[in-house]
Regions:
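Membrane-embedded alpha-helical bundles of multi-pass integral membrane proteins
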Residues: 1-244, 290, 303-336
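Short, solvent-exposed loop/turn segments enriched in Ser/Thr/Gly
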Residues: 370-376
C-alpha cells in the first residue's frame, strides 16, 4: 500500500508535507532588537506580577471581581450596572488596537503579547538551559523522551503554577489568594480548580502547543488582512537588494544580490516561516530575522537592513513611507469621541447610588391610623 501523496502546494510552516507536526527549534541571534525586546518583556512580566499588589484608593489597581460583580480599574470601581461606561471603555480600547495595528502592524504580537513574552523570554531560555541549542534539540527529537529533556518539565510545571496563581490574583485579590494558599484546597475548591485548570492550560500551551497558538488559534492574525494596508509597518525582506541570491559571498563581477541564501532568517523564526516569501499570516514581527540577517551581513561586509522594518510600499519601491492617510486620522478621531464620552460620564457620575427596595416580608402593615409600607433603602458609596 502506497504512502500519503506529497502536498502539491505550500503547507503550514509547522507541518511536514505528510501533515505531521514539525517541531520548531529557533536558533537564537542576540542583536540590538533582541536586547530591546528582552528589556521590554521583563518590564511587562514585572508589571503583570506586580500590578495585583498595587493599590489605589484602597483598592487593587486592577481587579476583576466576578463573584462580587465589581471591576476596579486604577482607582475607579465599575459595577455590573455600569454597562454604558464599560461599553465605552471596551470600544476605546478596541479602536486603539485597530489604530496601532494600522500604524505599526503586529508590533503587539512580537513585543507585548504574553504568548511571545513568556515563550521567548521565559520558557524557551529554560528549555535551552536543559536541552542545549537548536542542533542539540533536533537530536533529542530523534531520540524521543530522554532524561535531559524530561528534566525541563518540572521547571515548566512550577512556572505554570506561578503564572496561574498570579492570574488568579487579578480575580480575587492578593490578600484573599494568600489566605487560600495557607489553607487546605478543600476549603476553597472553586479557586483551587480555577488555578489548576489555568496551570494545566499554561503548561500545555508553552510545553507543547507553542507557535500554533499564533498561527492557528489567535484571531488577531486573521484580521491583519483587514487591519493592515500597504503603508503599515511590517518586518520585510528587500527583494530589490537581495535578489538574485547566491550561495556564499558573491565573486567580483557576479550579478548577485546581497542575500547569500544562508537561511539564518528561517532557522531563527519562532513560527518557522521564510520572511523572504513576503508578508504572511504567521509572521508575528518579532524581529528575530532582522537580528539574524544583520549579523550575517556584518560577517560578509554588507550593510545591515536587508531584512528590516518598513512598509510594503517602501520595501517594493524603495520610496519613503507616508504615514499620513485617511485611516491614520479617522481612527484617532473615533477614539477621541468615545474617550471623551467616557470621561464625560465618569465626571458627571454621582458620589453615591440610592436604591429603594421592597421590604422583607409583607409589603405593608395595616394600622389603626393608616397603612405602613415596608421599604428598604440601599446606599452605595461611589466616590473614589
Amino acid at each position: 500500500m502506497s504512502g500519503p501523496l506529497p502536498a502539491q502546494e505550500r503547507v503550514l510552516p509547522t507541518l511536514n508535507a505528510d501533515g505531521s507536526r514539525r517541531r520548531i527549534h529557533p536558533r537564537l541571534y542576540k542583536g540590538r532588537l533582541y536586547t530591546a525586546r528582552l528589556i521590554t518583556a521583563w518590564g511587562l512580566i514585572a508589571l503583570f506580577v506586580g500590578l495585583p499588589f498595587l493599590h489605589i484608593n484602597g483598592k487593587p489597581a486592577l481587579l476583576l471581581d466576578v463573584t462580587g460583580r465589581e471591576f476596579s480599574f486604577f482607582g475607579r470601581t465599575f459595577l455590573a450596572t455600569d454597562g454604558m461606561l464599560l461599553m465605552l471603555l471596551m470600544i476605546t480600547i478596541f479602536l486603539s488596537v485597530i489604530w496601532l495595528t494600522a500604524l505599526v502592524g503586529r508590533a503587539w504580537c512580537g513585543w507585548g503579547c504574553p504568548q511571545t513574552v513568556y515563550m521567548e523570554f521565559v520558557f524557551r531560555p529554560i528549555e535551552r538551559l536543559f536541552e542545549g541549542g537548536r542542533a542539540d534539540q533536533i537530536k533529542l527529537d530523534k531520540q524521543g523522551l530522554s532524561l535531559r529533556r524530561a528534566l525541563k518539565y518540572p521547571a515548566f510545571l512550577l512556572l505554570s503554577i506561578l503564572v496561574a496563581n498570579v492570574f488568579l490574583a487579578y480575580f480575587v485579590g492578593v490578600e484573599r489568594l494568600w489566605q487560600w494558599m495557607q489553607k487546605s484546597p478543600a476549603e476553597h475548591p472553586v479557586g483551587f480548580l480555577v488555578m489548576g485548570v489555568t496551570a494545566a492550560l499554561v503548561m500545555f500551551d508553552f510545553a507543547y502547543f507553542r507557535e500554533q497558538m499564533c498561527t492557528v488559534v489567535c484571531p488577531y492574525a486573521r484580521l491583519q488582512s483587514v487591519l493592515l494596508d500597504d503603508r503599515s509597518l511590517i518586518v520585510g525582506y528587500d527583494k530589490q537588494r537581495g535578489e538574485p541570491r547566491s550561495k556564499g559571498k558573491a565573486k567580483p563581477g557576479e550579478d548577485a544580490g546581497d542575500c547569500i541564501d544562508c537561511n539564518a532568517c528561517v532557522v531563527t523564526c519562532p513560527t518557522g516561516i521564510d520572511i523572504r516569501e513576503g508578508l504572511q499570516l504567521e509572521c508575528i514581527t518579532c524581529t528575530q530575522c532582522i537580528d539574524a540577517c544583520n549579523s550575517i551581513m556584518h560577517k560578509i561586509g554588507k550593510p545591515p537592513g536587508l531584512i528590516r522594518y518598513g512598509s510594503q510600499t517602501s520595501l517594493e519601491t524603495g520610496a519613503r513611507t507616508r504615514i499620513a492617510r485617511p485611516r491614520a486620522f479617522i481612527y484617532p478621531a473615533l477614539i477621541g469621541v468615545f474617550a471623551s464620552a467616557l470621561v464625560f460620564f465618569l465626571m458627571r457620575g454621582q458620589s453615591a447610588d440610592v436604591m429603594l427596595l421592597r421590604g422583607i416580608g409583607a409589603p405593608y402593615v395595616v394600622q389603626g391610623d393608616g397603612i405602613r409600607n415596608q421599604l428598604r433603602v440601599k446606599i452605595e458609596n461611589r466616590s473614589p
